[in-house]
């Protein structure tokens, strides 16, 4: 057994309904390399529970009232103060109600019986959202939503990040870390702490924690990893101030993913070098390109608070592959090497995890599971009779046949997230999507006919896309509404490290601007040769959303956990909520909330 004591950390803000894959996966890889003294902490979930505690919400009300009083004493308010006053006033009105009911709301979100009743679920969801809005008012203009976090400081700018790390009035995680995390860490002599940054909005919370740990325990080696770290690694390495509180970065092979592909090996190699007496270097790459996932044991979720996630059932993330088997879309940077796990190993892992953690529910976190892998895994799952239920993400391609969809359903697939992007033939070809409107329609129908809930993602405002072409996508979705459970749509922006960014003229992009003041931005500012203007795109998106809201059932539209289609609640609803979706027995009952007199 190796002697290094290690802590793996997932910082705010992410999905509070399930664990994130990278930590359990890294823990398992480290154990296989002899590092057994490894703890893992989900500070993302902990931060939600800290601020949504009844006692903390009572303090929020005190802070809100005090701030309102201070603003009231001013002779006049400027525009920013007026906006803050409005948010504080709303929070002061809602907080007594929210404080009384937050415990019941969290209980509903963890209860499979209550959560399956739409009215009670939506009532609990409303309390949760309003509680976060009230906390946001306390830290105005910071906005904390489920799975989203925004400050007046941009995570795309190193200078603004540094300012955010000490902004007491803006950064809620300073209090959370000082009150709930640092005292806990002080009692355990960790040698190395690895902070996994998966999403852009985690950069400020992650580095806030790193800086506080550096000040409190300067002898701890602080490592930064995860997908976002890997994506930005060259730019982060050019940021000298980062080295004052981060000792090393261990990055993935060029395969962006929820788990890690090579980053876990690189971290193990760093630990081995440190035990051999070498000083940790600032940047560590995988020593070799990852050609197989055979080196990865099943993820180890031990030590995570699996009963505290805000989900009616425990949904565990798992990956059958890394990367995208297509890897040619011009708008996407997921073009690295694609590697798969052997289907027999997948089934063996799922059987182990299901038995060990007493759950039937799994979220396949692959970027997109290939039709061939779906066929192999479905066949073996059915043969093994594991009786598990799962969600996956797929490309709408010809390989998703009616036969394959039936096989997937028989093996427990209950929900699929489908990246439609556009339903216009020219735009699909321009994007190198590798599909057609006819194939899109057939895939959706095949999945629906097999009993698999279909969730669609699309984009508006692709380079040179006209309003008529964007309308083709909307008309397509409305025509296929019987096969679609819900739709998510966002405005398209060109991202760095994509073919569109490298060869803009090919896609009708006239100018492209990589703002030097935003080196950590994913997106680029562009102007196109034709298509809709930004104002026209925003106007069409509003029209798109109104049309979809009218077309899809209210329960289908709203019952995905705060609009995040990958969540545990989506899979649960697909498995169990159908019998309740038209029930009127609970109408008006809601959460049995205690209303203000």
Sequence positions of predicted segments:
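Acidic, low-complexity intrinsically disordered segments
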Residues: 2-347, 355-356
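Short acidic/polar active-site loop segments enriched in Thr and Asp
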Residues: 36, 191, 359-360, 414, ...
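Radical SAM [4Fe-4S] cluster-binding motif and immediate context
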Residues: 291-453, 475
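Flexible loop/turn segments at secondary-structure boundaries
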Residues: 14-17, 47-48, 200-204, 230-232, ...
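C-terminal non-catalytic accessory extensions
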Residues: 566-597
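A structural motif corresponding to the C-terminal lobe/cap of the Radical SAM core domain
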Residues: 2, 7-14, 21-22, 42-45, ...
């Amino acid at each position: 057994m190796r002697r290094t004591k290690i802590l793996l950390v997932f910082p705010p803000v992410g999905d509070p309904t399930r664990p994130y894959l990278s930590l359990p996966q890294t823990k398992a890889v480290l154990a296989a390399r002899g590092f057994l003294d490894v703890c893992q902490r989900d500070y993302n979930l902990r931060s939600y529970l800290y601020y949504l505690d009844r006692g903390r919400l009572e303090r929020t009300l005190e802070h809100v009232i005090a701030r309102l009083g201070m603003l009231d004493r001013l002779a006049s308010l400027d525009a920013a103060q007026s906006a803050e006053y409005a948010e504080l006033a709303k929070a002061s009105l809602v907080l007594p109600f929210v404080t009384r009911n937050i415990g019941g709301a969290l209980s509903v979100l963890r209860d499979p019986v209550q959560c399956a009743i739409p009215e009670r679920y939506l009532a609990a969801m409303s309390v949760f959202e309003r509680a976060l809005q009230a906390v946001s008012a306390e830290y105005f203009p910071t906005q904390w939503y489920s799975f989203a976090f925004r400050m007046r400081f941009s995570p795309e700018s190193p200078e603004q990040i540094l300012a955010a790390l000490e902004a007491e009035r803006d950064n809620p995680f300073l209090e959370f870390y000082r009150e709930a995390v640092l005292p806990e860490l002080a009692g355990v002599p960790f040698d190395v702490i690895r902070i996994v940054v998966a999403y852009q909005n985690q950069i400020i919370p992650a580095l806030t924690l790193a800086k506080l740990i550096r000040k409190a325990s300067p002898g701890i080696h602080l490592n930064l990893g995860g997908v976002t770290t890997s994506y930005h690694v060259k730019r982060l390495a050019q940021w000298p101030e980062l080295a004052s509180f981060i000792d090393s970065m261990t990055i993935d092979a060029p395969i962006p993913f929820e788990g890690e592909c090579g980053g876990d090996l690189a971290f193990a190699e760093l630990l081995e070098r440190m035990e051999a007496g070498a000083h940790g270097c600032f940047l560590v790459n995988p020593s070799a390109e990852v050609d197989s996932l055979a080196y990865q044991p099943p993820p180890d979720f031990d030590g995570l608070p699996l009963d505290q996630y805000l989900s009616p059932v425990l949904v565990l993330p798992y990956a059958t592959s890394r990367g995208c088997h297509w890897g040619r879309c011009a708008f996407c940077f997921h073009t690295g090497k694609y590697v798969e796990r052997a289907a027999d190993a997948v089934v063996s892992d799922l059987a182990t995890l299901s038995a060990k953690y007493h759950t039937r529910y799994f979220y396949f976190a692959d970027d997109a599971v290939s039709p061939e892998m779906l066929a192999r895994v479905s066949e073996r799952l059915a043969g093994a009779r594991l009786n598990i239920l799962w969600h996956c993400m797929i490309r709408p391609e010809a390989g998703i046949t009616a036969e394959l969809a039936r096989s997937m359903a028989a093996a427990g697939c209950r929900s699929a997230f489908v990246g439609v992007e556009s339903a216009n033939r020219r735009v699909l070809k321009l994007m190198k999507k590798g599909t057609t409107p006819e194939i899109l329609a057939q895939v959706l129908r095949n999945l629906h006919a097999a009993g698999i809930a279909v969730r669609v993602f699309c984009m508006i405002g692709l380079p040179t896309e006209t309003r008529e072409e964007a309308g083709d996508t909307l008309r397509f979705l409305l025509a296929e509404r019987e096969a679609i459970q819900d739709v998510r749509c966002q405005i398209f922006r060109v991202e760095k490290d994509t073919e569109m960014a490298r060869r803009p003229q090919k896609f009708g992009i006239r100018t492209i601007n990589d703002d030097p003041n935003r080196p950590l931005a994913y997106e680029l500012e562009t102007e196109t040769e034709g298509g809709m203007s930004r104002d026209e795109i925003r106007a069409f998106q509003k029209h798109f959303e109104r049309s979809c809201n009218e077309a899809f059932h209210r329960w289908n539209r709203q019952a995905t956990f705060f609009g995040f289609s990958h969540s545990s609640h989506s899979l649960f609803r697909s498995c169990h909520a159908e019998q309740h979706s038209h029930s009127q027995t609970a109408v008006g009952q809601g959460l049995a909330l205690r209303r203000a007199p």
